[in-house]
């Protein structure tokens, strides 16, 4: 029978975004550790607050399982003679503290040997737990690690106390100069009297009694209960991002929801400014009325009880008023001038130290946009809209509002463009080029915004690729993963017929690096893009489909997307298995570096190879142009594939491909190679499961 185990790591306040990754790591490590140590357990629970990381293991076994091991001893003919164990065998068992009854003889590849079957008793869990605690804390990786004082230990934030209990027994361990005990600490809003934890079983209740809700799910539900109660009692509608709830949950240990308000005059500001100020700057929950209009009310989550709540509300209202007053000033100052005026400031804003200013970037993007427009054959009106949009799309970076609220770039550009009287759809293009900002964000509704977004991201990535600023491990300070993710979604879902590699090469030319940076950096960049693309596609398609399609190239995302959609549907058809099997047979026989020649009909002697050649010509004439155009779905209704698959099988069953006659052999290999190349236009069939 096991006991419950408790480990509480008390720290200084941990940034909210550090906590979820730590929870996952602690859970995985704990399961793996005790599995490897062969100690049974019922469940592992990881709880967290801003100041505590907690492992709670239910019914952790009191000792390791006994392990049976076999030790090979001397050869049987030495240790066992005339039905008796020899002195050699006796010395062998004495060496391991065993008896002759534990010996047996087994046949091995090297002959018969004596083996000792020994049961190794498991260690007590109490002896193992100090190592578990130390190993666990050393294993956790945070987005940023820190060292404090003169201790040689790295963690997300300084460790201040450790509680470690197995049942009611203290586990003695010292980490980063902190010795474990059974005493936790109260929240900061209470007198700092240590909290005694008598045993692991009583932990949650003792913490609740001291105004600490350790379980993040319980805490989140408490927040939801309270904010919904306030909203319902006042006939308001809650409207907030999911990330806000997650962040607030990791900012408090004992949540209390309070209703505050601000001056109605600030409702004249753009709604997005109010929401960003409340959600991002202050972590408040905005409230709407029954008609969906934003109100001048908000909910703040206090870390503590409702004692002195009026003072707390007034303090939060005062802080919000100051922020909104600043925003009002920025807005009024910004709107004194048309948006175009702020383009003058772009030459003073650095894009990247070695890649120039934002103005330099705009000029590069302008050339790239013209190139894309030419490739796509845009109309003169569409070209004019794009030209004007390029002029203005970074202008809001020169405004006061975006200087204070960088996350509003593009969004304020759209608002200011409308106020400045820019004609539709220019404000829309300016405001939407930023999307998607994350992998699950929305896409632009206007394809011209997609073009601008593609050009902007291509320019950024080309510069970073040239400078070799690739992410290392989990670190990605420039945000290459985010930028490339947005680019890939635009290319995959916009269906614009563009070649990604060619755009990178063109962008590289526009930068005019000269001999400073090699063009080969684009190859390295495409490798990085390929890995990002594969990860993105694996969320939607099976691994064999993704690898089969990517193997034939991913320069043209529109083709890749069509190939993926085609094979996903084709897999459901009866002809799929036959064609895959036939083509795989063909793939296996072709030498890797074989270069096909033109097939000579005069050398086709067998009726089976003649028929296969006719099949090849038929497919080439009837649907190959469709395949080249990316119309792969024509194959879904192409009934000839069944007959073609049968003819490949008949060819292999009746024709000697590797003929002793060299001309005949090369001719047959050339026919097979041409068939492979024809279907290679779609995917690598050998990778399909």
From Swiss-Prot:
A molecular-function term among this protein's GO annotations: glycine-tRNA ligase activity
Keywords noted in UniProt: Aminoacyl-tRNA synthetase, ATP-binding, Cytoplasm, Ligase, Nucleotide-binding, Protein biosynthesis
This protein's record includes keyword ATP-binding: yes
Domain of life: Bacteria
A Pfam family annotated for this UniProt entry: tRNA_synt_2f
Catalytic activity as recorded in UniProt: tRNA(Gly) + glycine + ATP = glycyl-tRNA(Gly) + AMP + diphosphate
One cellular component term from this protein's GO annotations in UniProt: cytosol
InterPro entries reported for this sequence: DALR_anticod-bd, Gly-tRNA-synth_bsu, Gly-tRNA-synth_heterodimer
Biological process according to GO: arginyl-tRNA aminoacylation; glycyl-tRNA aminoacylation
Signal peptide segment: none
EC number assigned by the record: 6.1.1.14
Subcellular location: Cytoplasm
UniProt-listed PANTHER family: GLYCINE--TRNA LIGASE, CHLOROPLASTIC_MITOCHONDRIAL 2, GLYCYL-TRNA SYNTHETASE
Family that this chain belongs to: Belongs to the class-II aminoacyl-tRNA synthetase family.
Subunit architecture: Tetramer of two alpha and two beta subunits.
Name this polypeptide is given: Glycine--tRNA ligase beta subunit
Lineage: Bacteria, Pseudomonadati, Dictyoglomota, Dictyoglomia, Dictyoglomales
């Amino acid at each position: 029978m096991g006991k419950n185990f408790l480990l509480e790591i008390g720290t200084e306040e941990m940034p909210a975004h550090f906590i979820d990754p730590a929870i996952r790591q602690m859970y995985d490590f704990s399961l793996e550790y005790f599995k490897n140590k062969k100690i049974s357990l019922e469940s592992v629970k990881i709880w967290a607050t801003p100041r505590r990381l907690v492992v709670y293991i239910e019914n952790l076994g009191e000792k390791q399982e006994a392990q049976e091991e076999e030790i090979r001893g001397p050869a049987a003919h030495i240790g066992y003679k005339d039905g008796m164990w020899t002195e050699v065998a006796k010395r062998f068992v004495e060496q391991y503290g065993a008896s002759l009854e534990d010996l047996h003889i087994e046949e091995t590849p090297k002959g018969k040997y004596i083996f000792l079957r020994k049961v190794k008793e498991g260690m007590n869990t109490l002896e193992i737990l100090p190592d578990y605690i130390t190993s666990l804390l050393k294993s956790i990786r945070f987005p940023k690690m820190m060292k404090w004082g003169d201790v040689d230990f790295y963690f997300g934030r300084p460790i201040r106390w450790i509680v470690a209990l197995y049942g009611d027994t203290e586990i003695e361990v010292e980490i980063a100069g902190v010795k474990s005990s059974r005493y936790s600490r109260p929240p900061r809003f209470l007198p700092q009297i240590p909290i005694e934890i008598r045993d692991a079983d009583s932990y949650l209740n003792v913490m609740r009694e001291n105004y600490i809700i350790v379980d993040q799910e319980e805490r989140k539900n408490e927040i939801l209960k309270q904010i919904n109660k306030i909203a319902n009692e006042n006939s308001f509608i809650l409207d907030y991002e999911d990330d806000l709830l997650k962040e607030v949950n990791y900012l408090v240990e004992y949540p209390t929801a309070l209703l505050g308000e601000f001056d109605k005059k600030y409702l004249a500001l753009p709604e997005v400014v109010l929401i960003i100020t409340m959600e991002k700057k202050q972590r408040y929950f905005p409230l709407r009325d029954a008609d969906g209009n934003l109100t001048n009310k908000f909910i703040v989550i206090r870390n503590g009880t409702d004692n002195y709540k009026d003072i707390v509300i007034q303090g939060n209202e005062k802080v919000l008023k100051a922020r909104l007053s600043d925003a009002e000033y920025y807005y009024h100052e910004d709107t004194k001038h048309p948006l175009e005026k702020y383009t003058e400031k772009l030459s003073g804003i650095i894009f990247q130290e070695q890649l120039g200013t934002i103005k330099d970037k705009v000029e590069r993007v302008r050339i790239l946009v013209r190139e894309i427009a030419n490739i796509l054959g845009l109309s003169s009106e569409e070209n004019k809209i794009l030209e004007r949009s390029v002029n203005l799309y970074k202008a809001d970076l020169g405004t006061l509002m975006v200087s204070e609220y960088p996350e509003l770039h593009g969004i304020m550009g759209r608002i200011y463009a409308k106020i400045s009287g820019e004609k539709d759809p220019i404000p829309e293009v300016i405001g939407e080029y930023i999307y998607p900002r994350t992998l699950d964000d929305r896409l632009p509704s206007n394809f011209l915004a997609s073009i601008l977004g593609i050009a902007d991201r291509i320019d950024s990535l080309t510069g970073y690729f040239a400078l070799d600023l690739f992410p290392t491990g989990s670190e990605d300070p420039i945000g290459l993963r985010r930028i490339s993710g947005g680019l890939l979604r635009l290319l995959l879902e916009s269906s614009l017929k563009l070649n990604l590699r060619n755009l990178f090469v063109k962008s590289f030319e526009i930068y005019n690096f000269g001999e400073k940076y090699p063009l080969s950096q684009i190859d390295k960049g495409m490798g990085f893009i390929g890995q990002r693309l594969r990860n993105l596609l694996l969320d939607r398609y099976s691994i064999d489909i993704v690898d089969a399609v990517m193997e034939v190239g991913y320069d043209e995302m529109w083709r890749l997307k069509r190939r993926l959609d085609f094979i996903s549907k084709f897999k459901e058809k009866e002809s799929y298995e036959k064609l895959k099997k036939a083509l795989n047979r063909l793939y296996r026989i072709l030498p890797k570096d074989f270069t096909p020649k033109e097939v000579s009909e005069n050398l086709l002697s067998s009726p089976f190879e003649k028929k296969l050649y006719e099949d090849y010509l038929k497919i080439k004439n009837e649907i190959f142009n469709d395949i080249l155009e990316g119309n792969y779905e024509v194959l879904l209704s192409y009934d000839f594939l069944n007959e073609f698959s049968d003819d490949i099988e008949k060819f292999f069953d009746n024709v000697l491909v590797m003929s002793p006659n060299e001309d005949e052999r090369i001719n047959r290999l050339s026919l097979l190679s041409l068939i492979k190349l024809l279907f290679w236009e779609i995917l690598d069939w050998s990778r399909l499961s």
